[in-house]
């Protein structure tokens, strides 16, 4: 088990100080909120498993947040997940990704927190990666480099304390030969001016009558197009055409708005709309609107249709005692 607690996009400084009892009823995604019975950090969970002589893998409590057991506060749902109830990754997700994935096959780097604070404020910055080295840059200047020893090391992220200045914070991951394998940037942002919608798995082919769901992420950007990572405006969502809206979620443990509504606020810059695919092919128009922001619109194409009458089966797996193919009249 782990029972580490964190809220997506919430950061309580400084990192070296354990912070739990907060008026916002949120847990710090930096990794400095802990419970009395749980692991002291995600790193400790990883190291305990890594350093055993044999391991079949790692079972973690929990992968996803879930409704109920709202420890350590009296809110709506748990804080234990590495992914929130809306399916958005928390920063701790990337620590486990760094430990369990191969940089030669799927290199990545992740820097947190977001980059928008008060000038001169000291900000704890962490970088997770499956690479051998990570480097942090602020507006093109190197802040420093850190070696991550995934096999024997006890510190599995690069860690810096940086005086905030507006601009771009960039993390670069390198392999053992110091060749760049991945990079990620976070940018300072202004006030939100418009909404943006993104379809999860846009290459997916949706089929009518197949009880399928489409997941649409709604976010906000500023006038320069940079994500506003703490946006919290209420968003009204409408769906027309060959599907319907089934619910909205933002992953906020303190939010008690209904999942089945058509209006809900973003939590730290994100809102998820879940759209059900109907019984007939065609197109689905999803619209999102918020006061004072330019609205967004997305079209989902439902290109195929299956029969929903009678009993269906997959011919390739049909079998009978004689071993013969199914008769033509069997559907």
Where are these regions (language model features)?
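Extracellular Ig-like/FN3 beta-sandwich strand-entry sites
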Residues: 164-168, 213, 281-283
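Extended substrate-binding grooves/exosites of carbohydrate-active enzymes
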Residues: 1-150, 157-180
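Short, hydrophobic beta-strand segments
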Residues: 158-164, 259-279
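Beta-strand-rich domain onsets/edges
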Residues: 190-222, 228-229
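Beta-strand-rich structural segments
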Residues: 125-129, 172-173, 211-228, 235, ...
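Short flexible loop/turn segments that cap and initiate beta-strands
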Residues: 130, 136-143, 183-185, 213, ...
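Short aromatic-acidic-glycine turn motif
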Residues: 146-148, 192-197, 238-254, 306-311
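Edge beta-strands of extracellular beta-sandwich domains
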Residues: 178-190, 294-304
């Amino acid at each position: 088990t782990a029972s580490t607690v964190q809220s997506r996009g919430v950061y309580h400084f400084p990192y070296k100080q354990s912070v739990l009892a907060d008026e916002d009823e949120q847990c710090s995604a930096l990794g400095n909120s802990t419970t009395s019975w749980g692991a002291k950090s995600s790193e400790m969970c990883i190291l305990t498993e890594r350093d055993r002589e044999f391991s079949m893998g790692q079972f973690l409590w929990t992968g996803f947040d879930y409704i109920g057991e709202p420890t350590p506060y009296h809110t709506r749902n748990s804080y234990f997940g590495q992914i929130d109830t809306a399916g958005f990754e928390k920063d701790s997700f990337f620590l486990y990704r760094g430990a369990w994935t191969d940089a030669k096959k799927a290199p990545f780097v992740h820097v947190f927190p977001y980059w928008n604070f008060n000038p001169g404020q000291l900000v704890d910055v962490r970088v997770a990666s499956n690479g051998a080295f990570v480097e942090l840059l602020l507006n093109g200047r190197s802040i420093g480099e850190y070696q991550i020893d995934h096999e024997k090391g006890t510190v599995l992220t690069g860690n810096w304390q940086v005086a905030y200045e507006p601009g771009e914070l960039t993390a670069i991951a390198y392999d053992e030969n110091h060749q760049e394998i991945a990079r990620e940037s976070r940018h300072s942002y202004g006030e939100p001016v418009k909404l943006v919608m993104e379809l999860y798995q846009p290459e997916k082919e949706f089929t009518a009558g197949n009880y399928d769901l489409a997941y649409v992420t709604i976010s906000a950007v500023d006038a320069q197009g940079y994500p506003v990572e703490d946006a919290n405006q209420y968003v009204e969502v409408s769906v027309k055409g060959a599907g319907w809206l089934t619910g909205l979620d933002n992953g906020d443990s303190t939010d008690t708005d209904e999942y089945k509504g058509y209006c809900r606020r973003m939590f730290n810059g994100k809102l998820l709309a879940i759209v059900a695919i109907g019984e007939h092919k065609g197109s689905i128009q999803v619209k999102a609107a918020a006061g004072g922001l330019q609205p967004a619109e997305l079209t989902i194409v439902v290109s195929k249709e299956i029969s929903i009458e009678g009993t269906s089966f997959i011919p390739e797996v049909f079998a009978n005692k004689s071993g013969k193919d199914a008769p033509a009249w069997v559907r």
